[in-house]
A protein has these predicted regions:
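Short, well-ordered coil/turn segments that N-cap beta-strands
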Residues: 25-29, 65-68, 98-100, 130-132, ...
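Conserved, mostly hydrophobic/aromatic
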Residues: 31, 70, 105, 134, ...
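Acidic (Asp/Glu)-rich catalytic clusters
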Residues: 23-24, 60-66, 92-97, 149-155, ...
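Conserved anion-binding
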Residues: 37, 106-206
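Active-site-adjacent beta->alpha loops and helix N-cap segments on the catalytic face
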Residues: 79-94, 111-116, 140-153, 212-220, ...
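Active-site beta-loop-alpha junctions enriched in small/polar residues
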Residues: 34-38, 75-77, 107-111, 137-139, ...
Length: 287
């Protein structure tokens, strides 16, 4: 992976435009920041706030000026309480300053003033925990996400909506049929596409589609937005799986690796080499 200059955010650019530029400049790769207790142990770090901080600082220092996207998993920071959230704030801030796009993996979903508060927490520029984009759950109805989508639009942020997840329990809900014959997942896909319909380049409302879902027959062709693809590497998905799944979506797919890269720490060169291998595999599969 060759070093690329940072991709600075611009208030005049939408999230979709910034993401597309980052993927073009640095290649189609997102690296998750998932400080599992087992990973901390593997790195020789204590399962504590100090271990969490050392882990996150090392990953950001090694990769944030090289990869297009990084994705901290909020839960692994939250488990340490306020001190862990403080580390998360610092991690997001440092990663963004280094030029990578940060998607906060929080999977929040609620209604009314509560979801509005989540939107302000994760997407308002005045929030200490603000990221470039956030993952959300639509299972209180897609319309419940309106405050998050509005907040994102107001500040040039992005939203990634869970659509087709790779956990075995997912299909019982996501593949269920609605009254008009579409699956629940297809209604989510179509609602996201409607949000992006007027975007001049790439819309800022994306979807989360697991790498291991297989060919489900869902139609993403009208999305005009990015697709975040977790589940690659240690979770069982392979880069080659994306060839069939996303054959009509080249250039907007954001493949995400976590343990497959993170397990090669704590040395920075090991992390960089693993990220290089993951990026090479994704480029071969998507181009």
């Amino acid at each position: 992976m060759t070093h690329q200059a940072p991709v600075p955010p611009s208030e005049k650019e939408s999230f979709g435009e910034r993401l597309q530029k980052a993927l073009s400049a640095r290649g189609p790769l997102c690296v998750g920041i998932d400080p599992h207790a087992s990973l901390l142990l593997r790195w020789g770090l204590p399962d504590s706030v100090d271990g969490l901080r050392s882990f996150a600082d090392t990953v950001v220092s090694a990769l944030a000026d090289r990869v297009a996207v990084m994705k901290p998993q909020s839960a692994f920071f939250e488990r340490f309480g306020a001190a862990g959230v403080s580390v998360l704030e610092s991690t997001i801030r440092q990663a963004r300053q280094a030029g990578t796009i940060v998607i906060l993996d929080a999977k929040r979903g609620d209604i009314g003033s509560t979801v509005q508060a989540y939107a302000q927490a994760y997407l308002s520029p005045t929030s200490p925990i603000a990221a470039d984009a956030v993952t959300v759950s639509p299972y209180l109805g897609f319309g419940s996400l309106a405050p998050v989508i509005d907040e994102a639009e107001a500040h040039g942020g992005g939203v990634f909506v869970l659509a087709l997840t790779s956990n075995p329990e997912g299909p019982s809900v996501q593949h269920a049929r609605t009254s008009d014959g579409r699956t629940v997942a297809q209604t989510i896909i179509d609602e996201a596409a409607a949000c992006n319909a007027k975007a001049p380049v790439l819309g800022s409302v994306g979807l989360v589609v697991g790498a291991t879902v297989g060919d489900t027959g869902h139609d993403l062709s009208a999305l005009n937005g990015p697709v975040l693809v977790p589940g690659l590497g240690a979770q069982g998905g392979a880069a080659d799986d994306m060839r069939g799944l996303f054959r009509d979506l080249r250039g907007v797919v954001v493949p995400s690796y976590s343990r497959e890269v993170l397990s090669h720490g704590p040395g920075k060169s090991g992390l960089r080499d693993a990220a290089d291998r993951a990026l090479s595999a994704c480029q071969k599969a998507l181009f």
